[in-house]
Structures are given as C-alpha cells and as structure tokens.
Amino acid sequence: MKKRGPLLAAFCIPLLITLIICVNREIYPFGDQCMLHIDMYHQYCPFFTELMEKLKTGGSTFYSWNIGLGADFVSLYAYYLASPLNWLLILWPRGYVIEFMTALSILKIALSGLTFTYYLGEHFLVWQDAGNAAA
C-alpha cells in the first residue's frame, strides 16, 4: 500500500512534464510540430513502419526489401525494435507511425520514472524501512 503513492508520482510527474513540454513546443497533438528529428525521423520511422507492416500483414520477419536496398530484418529488430512496447503498433492505425512514436516516447519517459523508483525502493529497501517505521 505504501508503494503506490511514490510509484504513481514517479509515473505521473515525468508524464506531466513531458506533456507540458509538448504543449509548449506545439508537438502533436498539441500543435503541428513533430518530436522526431534527424535519425529518429529518417531511420527509426521507416523501421517502425516496416515493423507495423510485418505485424499487420504477417510478412517475413527475416528479410525486408523495403529498407534501403534490402536488409536483414532479424538483426534490425534485435538492435532497434526489440522493446516489447513496440508491439503496441498492432493497435495503432496505419499512416500514424510518427504519432505512435511520439506517444511511445512519452510513455517510455513516464515508465522510466516508475521503474527507476521501484528499483530504488527495492534496492535500498525503502519500502521495508517505511513499514518498520510505521510499526
């Protein structure tokens, strides 16, 4: 019970800060700007698009002719796309990969706050100390 408050705050605070930045910088859906720049736009976005197509159409996951002059998709997946959160692409409509990547970046920032707070609590036994102090 005592874990929920800090964990919820550790998720919500980075989420709110990131959303405030998106509003301030007019990043979609709060404006017409995009969070993707340079490599994220020119490299990751085509990789995510190809992953979406493979997940939705059942295409071969071993090789892709749609990336450059063709590429080994297994190594590309292992290096760039292996996050389990990327599988949320299945739920996203085609044509909105950039918007998905923006939402995914915001979610990952919030989850990093949550998981790091959980790690600190377990590693330094903060949860146990809070329980002993109450007893």
Task: Outline where the language-model segments fall.
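Generic detector of intrinsically disordered, low-complexity, polar/charged segments
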Residues: 2, 28, 65-67, 128-131
